[in-house]
Amino acid sequence: MRDIIKDQGLLSFLPQKLDAELVQGSTMVKHAFPIFQKGGVVMDVTNVTQAEIAEDAGATAVMVLDKLPYDVRKSGGVARMADPKIIEEVMNSITIPVMAKVRIGHYYEAKILEALGVDMIDESEVLTPADEEHHINKWEFKVPFVNGARNLGEALRRITEGASMIRTKGEAGTGNVSEAVKHMKIINGEIRSLISMSEEDRMKKAREYQVPYQIVELTVKLGRLPVVNFAAGGIATPADAALMMWLGADGIFVGSGIFKSQDPDVRAKAIVLATANWEDPEIVLEAQKMISESKSMMGIDIKALKPEELLQVRGQ
């Protein structure tokens, strides 16, 4: 595991010493767990039945929440973390890792999930933020966190706060991959810009991003984010998943795209197949043929959303 962390270049930035024993909750373990998810698909689920479908389809993990993002968007009101009893039932029914979402800034929802024993916490803009100004200080926790980002500044701020994994925000619950594409391209484009900058300009960028200069330098050295970066937000088909992998994602989160479709069992398997074999168009074609477009979730045009309906703007 130490070799994996060294390969990621994290030794020069992370605050804890990584030459110690491997202990649960250590920085090394928290940053290694997401690395083992690379190339896989994490699926949103709301109950045991969906979790079992996800596991059977080959998902590397599930994300438990009270409502799928599409339903969160439609129902309105305050979206909170899932019922701990449901999360526990899912944990007891499957063998793959179980993640769960908390509201941005809600320290105690995160503490509850840590006590419950989830494998990872998503501090998510899909839920109603508890703190409009600040995210959770994730260094205090033994469990690893994933956070969303639309650009490099957001990504590096979340990593500085202790996030072990980043995902594009996209626009969750829409079945529209366009925002995930945009966010992935922005992050990768801003990394390329950093690489071409002088040291003085990089220091200015660090101040602009409100992050330590060391993490900017580490990003330049690696030529990528210092942690795993998955794609999320609007992924609904095998082709969507393959596209995001082609754009540089390390893996895929699928929210409403599977269980708001009319063919969740086969769609889950098809998305896993396309993600694992994104470099082979013939296999992606096979995956796409497994599903029927007529059974896909009803998508939402991003342009039809009012500014206050956008989830991605939460937590900058």
UniProtKB/Swiss-Prot annotation:
Binding site for D-glyceraldehyde 3-phosphate: K185
PROSITE patterns hit by this protein: PDXS_SNZ_1, PDXS_SNZ_2
Keyword annotations from UniProtKB, A to Z: Lyase, Pyridoxal phosphate, Schiff base
GO biological process: amino acid metabolic process; pyridoxal phosphate biosynthetic process; pyridoxine biosynthetic process
Broad EC category: lyase
Top-level division of the source organism's lineage: Archaea
InterPro entries: Aldolase_TIM, PdxS/SNZ, PdxS/SNZ_N, RibuloseP-bd_barrel
Residues annotated as catalytic: K101
The reaction(s) this protein catalyses: aldehydo-D-ribose 5-phosphate + D-glyceraldehyde 3-phosphate + L-glutamine = pyridoxal 5'-phosphate + L-glutamate + phosphate + 3 H2O + H(+)
Family statement: Belongs to the PdxS/SNZ family.
Subunit details: In the presence of PdxT, forms a dodecamer of heterodimers.
Name of this chain's protein: Pyridoxal 5'-phosphate synthase subunit PdxS
